[in-house]
Amino acid sequence: MNAFDNADVMIPKTVVLCTDIFDEFMDTNELYQIALSDIPDEEILRAFLQARLPERLIGDLEAYLDVVRQPIAIRSSSLLEDAHYQPFAGIYSTYMIPYVESRDVRLKMLRDAIKGVYASVFYRDSKAYMTATSNVIDQEKMAVILQEVAGNRYGDRFYPNISGVARSVNYYPIGDEQAEDGTVNLALGLGKNIVDGGMNLRVCPAHPDKVLQTSEMEIALRETQTRFYALEMKAVEEDFRVDDGFNLLKLPVKEAEQDGSLQFIASTYDPYDMVIRDGIYDGGRKLVTFCGVLQQGVFPLSLI
């Protein structure tokens, strides 16, 4: 973990709620009749939010909240999500809750988020995908991962300077790239931008100084990130929705410039000289190129 002089690698504080909690929650609250019906998703969510989590779980959740001072992601981890031939990744909900001073408020948000993830197993789209893949919905089991969110707070919003998705195989190598080099997709803000197919930067870790999207000015102006996601830092204890992104903000990159979070990751387009310069300068459009990280070695991301 300490192989790099200018970087500390830390694992977010994480807790897993195993599938037995899901089984007990469903059986104790007699939710299967409602969950397997054809009622709207909103009514399913409402029924799940009104149900009670196992009492033995609450003390553990309180202990987790005592040591986490960051927002928390509440992620699905079902038996079918990692199926080799018919993966369910991306089908179920992932909620994020902000950090607020009141532990009682955070506990209420955390409990509701867990219930929301459970409810998402039985939403209309989940059932349709289950049918299309010839799986049986009442055999699905849901674990839940609670994980500290990395990032920084800027006023009433929270987001990381860098988020990314790494792939071990590069299916479309360009130039000197090799398939075994893998690829990384980088973005400013929360990783939802990448997962949802938004504009991000595709990089080969073996060749961080050769990025197709920034190889020419016209391409960079057209193909680099223009908006990013941040978590709204206000309590949502009475406002959970079927849409798990209901408390996320989609903001223009200019907002990040005002936050001061673009240092080392942005370049500036000079419309007078018609050039792109690495770094932040007055005037001109800011482009998310990760130049300081990829080309200047400010942070050894490609090595990590």
Which residues are covered by each model-predicted region?
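Conserved mixed alpha/beta core segments that line enzyme active sites in large multi-domain catalysts
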Residues: 1-3, 52-304
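A conserved helix-loop-beta module that forms one wall/lid of the active-site cleft
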Residues: 1-55, 290-298
